[in-house]
Regions:
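Cytosolic regulatory regions of ion transport systems
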Residues: 1-446
Length: 448
């Protein structure tokens, strides 16, 4: 499938890498030759140096027979115009654009994006997606992440096996046998600096961070068995009132789950805007690195401190200060992925990388109707994907024993006729099964 990616930054590069592994015919356009050199040296894709919104550049990239256009340059306007030209001149079927500026995304202008105006088929807003990701964590105490799957019948959760985890040393199979009534399946583990896909004989240890799929109705019981009985946080402090902070505050304000929330914003004009547009959130104008400000918002009583300014260093330091002052859990926005592996060792509980979230949402849109959800994990370690099994899939009408799947793929669950199945070696896959699976990054998903 011929695909043009406009923008060779971290997001564009990662998408090109993923799609080229799945036999997409990818061309990457960028104005920066250094970025393109990195792409061409490492990936099996074509590169074009030029301005993506110029018709001649798109034509040179193969737009006349292109099926998917992905615009992820640093400019919203370039992304929007590129999609317009891709539609008007080249009749490209699917156009996906990353748009950051929230003014373009207001409900007042929702009719802007259609074939008569800006023909963009899917808009990805990193700020809104990050806010949703943080909110999921707030309403899922005991987890480090949570994603709803299979029409909310299942959840993908990440959790840490704390010192009060009573089943340390048991294998995945032994845990399943010990709790046969729980519809849950462990898929992969982070252990220190190691990340690996599990099999039935993998033993679970204290301090492991595990990711599993679990039936929504069993979630509380499963969390309890892993040593988590945390209550819903009653208070949160947000540091940073930019687009992400504002979007998160709105989600909290409109939620049925009550969380008393304080928001700290350094810019006076922005703080006044936030205060006038948020009804139930207390806004304080000040520096999130100022201990006096942290005391003023009673950080010591907070279940969560959420540091989401545009500055990684400010986010890290404010999280550490908040933890030292008594905040229970820190959530920290990190744009530089080089920091992520270091932070858990110095007291930062959870990190959010906007690039990973953006990449997941774009891949979900690219892969088409058979993909329901796509969630990237662990700084490029792999993806959890929810997909409908197609008749041509190599999974269809075979069981796991026959398939001999590669080591880095783990099937988590099947939903068939609204019934949840945790698969074993004899489970046969059927057409239209809703399957959740994990695949490490280096594995091609083209036949799934």
């Amino acid at each position: 499938m011929k695909t043009i990616i406009c923008g060779a930054g971290d997001v564009g590069y990662s998408i090109a890498d993923k799609l080229s592994r799945e036999n997409f015919e990818v061309t990457v356009i960028d104005e920066d030759e250094n970025r393109l050199n990195k792409v061409s040296e490492n990936l099996d894709v074509k590169t074009i140096n030029g301005i993506p919104s110029m018709p001649s550049v798109l034509e040179n990239a193969g737009a006349n027979d292109c099926e998917i256009l992905i615009a992820v340059t640093k400019s919203d306007e370039t992304n929007m115009v590129t999609c317009q030209i891709g539609h008007s001149l080249f009749k490209i079927k699917k156009k996906i654009a990353r748009i950051r500026q929230q003014d373009y995304l207001k409900n007042d202008w929702k009719n802007l994006y259609n074939d008569e105006n800006f023909p963009i088929d899917a808009i990805i807003s990193p700020e809104q997606e990050v806010a949703k990701g943080i909110f999921r964590r707030l309403i899922s105490p005991g987890t480090i992440d949570m994603v709803e799957l299979s029409d909310k019948k299942l959840k993908l959760i990440g959790l840490k096996c704390e010192d009060n985890f009573l089943h340390s040393g048991l294998s995945v199979r032994e845990l399943s046998e010990k709790f046969p009534d729980y519809l849950a399946n462990i898929m992969f583990i982070f252990r220190g600096d190691q990340k690996f896909t599990v099999n039935s004989s993998t033993k679970i240890e204290k301090k492991d961070t595990i990711f599993l799929v679990v039936e929504t109705d069993n979630l509380t019981d499963v969390l309890s068995e892993f040593g988590h009985q945390e209550l819903q946080a009653k208070k949160a402090v947000i540091i940073g009132g930019g687009n992400i902070g504002f979007s998160l505050a709105q989600l909290i304000e409109n939620s049925e789950t009550y969380i008393k929330t304080e928001l700290i914003e350094a810019n006076k004009e922005r703080a006044e805007f936030l205060a006038s547009n948020l009804e139930n959130i207390t806004v304080t104008c000040g520096d999130g690195l100022d201990n006096q400000i942290l005391e003023e918002v009673n950080i010591s009583d907070s279940g969560y401190c959420i540091s989401i300014t545009e500055d990684d260093e400010v986010n890290i330091l404010s999280s550490l200060l908040a933890k030292r002052a008594g905040a229970n859990t820190s959530i920290t926005l990190i744009n530089n992925s080089n920091y992520s592996s270091l932070l858990s060792n110095i007291g930062v509980d959870m990190t959010i990388d906007p690039k990973i979230i953006t990449i997941s949402k774009i891949l979900e849109k690219v892969r088409g109707v058979k993909i329901r959800n796509d969630y990237s994990i662990g700084e490029g370690f792999g993806e959890v994907i929810e997909a409908d099994i197609q008749s041509e899939s190599f999974l269809c009408n075979k069981n796991l024993k026959e398939l001999e799947l590669p080591k880095g793929i783990r099937i988590g669950s099947i939903v068939r006729d609204k019934k949840i199945i945790i698969p074993n070696s004899q489970t046969v896959f059927k057409e239209n099964d809703d399957v959740v699976f994990f695949a490490e990054t280096n594995l091609s998903l083209i036949h799934i």
